[in-house]
Each structure stands twice: as C-alpha cells, then as structure tokens.
Amino acid sequence: MNSDPEEEAELPYEIGQAASVGDFERVKAWLAGGSASAPRSINSSGDHDWTLLHWTAARARSPEYIEFARYLISQGARVDAKTCHGWTTLHLACGFTGDATPVVVSMLSLLVATGATVNMEATYGHTPLFKIDRVSESTIDIVTILPRAGASLDFTHRQGWTRSFEEHLNQHIYNPSSAHVGAIRDLVASVRAAGSWKAHCRLPHKQILRLRSLVARGRVKLPRARRRSPRGRDTRQERALEFLVRQGDNGIVWNILSFWRATY
C-alpha cells in the first residue's frame, strides 16, 4: 500500500467506490472521520494501492468529477501516485473511462496542469498515451494534450522492445476502423515528421512564409483580388491567406503570425 511514514487509515473499498460513482459527500465525511492514531489521509490507498484520486480520475462521467479531483489535488492528493501495477491517474484517465468524452479531456487537462508526469512508466513500461484502447470523437483532444505536454510517441517495454503509437493504433485499439482514427494518424504523423509538438504547430507559419517568398519572387501567381466572394468558412480562410501572401515587408505578416499561436 502506498502511504506516508505515519500510520494512516487504509482506504476502504466502499469509499473508493463512492468516489467512483460520484458520492463525494460520503468521501468527504469519511476523510473527516479519522482519529489522531489513525488519520485518514487524502492519499490513503486501499485495494491495489488505489487512492481517491485514482478512483475519481478513472471513472470521470460529469463535471462534478473534475471539481472533486480539483478539490483532492488542492488538499494534497499526489497526481503521480502509483497503483500496484504502476498506473498513475493519467494512465487510468486514458484507459479506464471507456470512450473519450469532453469530461475525460477536462480531467486529463486538469491532471497535466497540476503536474502529472506525461511520460511516467507503469510496471511494464507503458506511458499514459499507450493506455488509450478505443477511439471516439474526443480522443484526438487527448492525443493533443499529451504530446503538447511532452509525451513521447514511443515507449520501451520492460522486456526491451519498443513500440510506436502508430503500431499501438494498429494493434491495440478496439475500433481501428473508426472514422476518427484517420485524423489521429495524420496528427501523429505530422508531429513525428516535424520532430516535436512545437515544430508541428509552426508548420503553417512556415508554409505561409514560404508561399509569400515565392509570390515576392514571381515564382507563384495569385488570382486577381475579388471584390465579392461566396460566403463560407473555407472561402474566408482562402481570402485571409491571399491577404497575407500579398503583403510586402511592411511588418503586417509578422504581426499576424505573432498572434497566431496554434495549440501549443
């Protein structure tokens, strides 16, 4: 059991279950009911070394779970505490909640923002990214949060072999034919090709500057500026791009790019 040097009360299974099902008032009542000889710590653990934060992160179903996790962390809950299998709260949030939902994404964001280690290895070497086992609409947000915070796209198993996240998507996803898997593959391929998350986010900036340079040297001709154009998001983006690449060395391009911070 994970515990501090002092003797603290073991976390009863039913209290862990209370955190799992969202009965947070019962959990708080249990925490308040300790004694000097057997204090009930926010980091008390029970079966399989699960703490209250493990139970809460693993079963996040509503915004109330996020608020309770925030409360636990504010009271000193260790975000990197490990279960007997070496899983941290990030591992459990990625792999135990079923399909990714906006609530799961919010839980991951909270854990990362409060210091969770994105490359923490479990007993066999798996990092949180490799606990993802199914893909839904919000999964790409998870695959954005973790690499953005520095998560590696590879992990080394305790037996010495290495697996890439691309291989993980091929072999360990329950629904590999999901329409969302393709978007994740494209994102991962772009990050890997760029060499880092920040470099991946800088690619659009470089592409605009390269196109602008070609226009300035007469290597590319843009269509004549239009007074009117059809409505639509794609058309507005095209017009914005045309505006950027038509600018000379007047500082406008650099000012715009300095404000355009693409998810990093």
PLM-predicted stretches and their roles:
Residues 12-20, 28:
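Amphipathic alpha-helical repeat scaffolds
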Residues 12, 24, 50, 66, ...:
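Generic preference for well-ordered alpha-helical elements
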Residues 7-15, 41-58, 82-96, 121-134, ...:
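Ankyrin-repeat boundary/"N-cap" motif
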Residues 29-40, 69-78, 106-117, 144-152, ...:
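Ankyrin repeat domain, specifically the short helix-to-loop turn at the C-terminus of the second helix
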Residues 166-264:
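Cullin-RING E3 adaptor/co-adaptor recruitment helices
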Residues 26, 64-68, 103-107, 141-142, ...:
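Conserved ankyrin/ankyrin-like repeat signature
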